[in-house]
Amino acid sequence: MLILTRKIGESLLIGDDVEITVLSIRGSQVKLGVKAPKEISVHREEIYQRIKVLADENPSE
């Protein structure tokens, strides 16, 4: 795992198309902004896990 330190307003790039920017920090909570092409899905981990479970329950698609 790569560990990075960023300040508010600073970004990191994933490949050529995905940019993640630190928007704010309040206590132990960090607000991130994500710029990515529309064809790349961006989900919080807990939402992605639910999507996977639903897909496993309904494999018709």
Curated annotation (Swiss-Prot):
<dbReference type="GO" id="GO:0006402">
    <property type="term" value="P:mRNA catabolic process"/>
</dbReference>
<dbReference type="GO" id="GO:0045948">
    <property type="term" value="P:positive regulation of translational initiation"/>
</dbReference>
<protein>
    <recommendedName>
        <fullName>Translational regulator CsrA</fullName>
    </recommendedName>
</protein>
<dbReference type="GO" id="GO:0005829">
    <property type="term" value="C:cytosol"/>
</dbReference>
<keyword id="KW-0963">Cytoplasm</keyword>
<dbReference type="GO" id="GO:0006109">
    <property type="term" value="P:regulation of carbohydrate metabolic process"/>
</dbReference>
<dbReference type="InterPro" id="IPR036107">
    <property type="entry name" value="CsrA_sf"/>
</dbReference>
<dbReference type="InterPro" id="IPR003751">
    <property type="entry name" value="CsrA"/>
</dbReference>
<comment type="subunit">
    <text>Homodimer; the beta-strands of each monomer intercalate to form a hydrophobic core, while the alpha-helices form wings that extend away from the core.</text>
</comment>
<dbReference type="GO" id="GO:0045947">
    <property type="term" value="P:negative regulation of translational initiation"/>
</dbReference>
<keyword id="KW-0678">Repressor</keyword>
<keyword id="KW-0694">RNA-binding</keyword>
<comment type="function">
    <text>A key translational regulator that binds mRNA to regulate translation initiation and/or mRNA stability. Mediates global changes in gene expression, shifting from rapid growth to stress survival by linking envelope stress, the stringent response and the catabolite repression systems. Usually binds in the 5'-UTR; binding at or near the Shine-Dalgarno sequence prevents ribosome-binding, repressing translation, binding elsewhere in the 5'-UTR can activate translation and/or stabilize the mRNA. Its function is antagonized by small RNA(s).</text>
</comment>
<keyword id="KW-0010">Activator</keyword>
<dbReference type="GO" id="GO:0048027">
    <property type="term" value="F:mRNA 5'-UTR binding"/>
</dbReference>
<keyword id="KW-0810">Translation regulation</keyword>
<dbReference type="Pfam" id="PF02599">
    <property type="entry name" value="CsrA"/>
</dbReference>
<comment type="similarity">
    <text>Belongs to the CsrA/RsmA family.</text>
</comment>
